[in-house]
Amino acid sequence: KPNFIRF
């Protein structure tokens, strides 16, 4: 699964 930053 892709990594992404959650704000």
Swiss-Prot record:
Keywords of this entry: Amidation, Neuropeptide, Secreted
Main subcellular location of this protein, as a coarse class: secreted
Subcellular localization, as worded in the UniProt entry: Secreted
Keyword Lipid metabolism: no
Residue positions where Phenylalanine amide is found in the record: 7
Listed GO biological process terms: neuropeptide signaling pathway
Any single GO CC term annotated in Swiss-Prot or TrEMBL for this entry: extracellular region
Known role: Myoactive; induces a rapid concentration-dependent muscle tension increase.
Protein name: FMRFamide-like neuropeptide PF4
Lineage, broadest ranks: Eukaryota, Metazoa, Ecdysozoa, Nematoda, Chromadorea
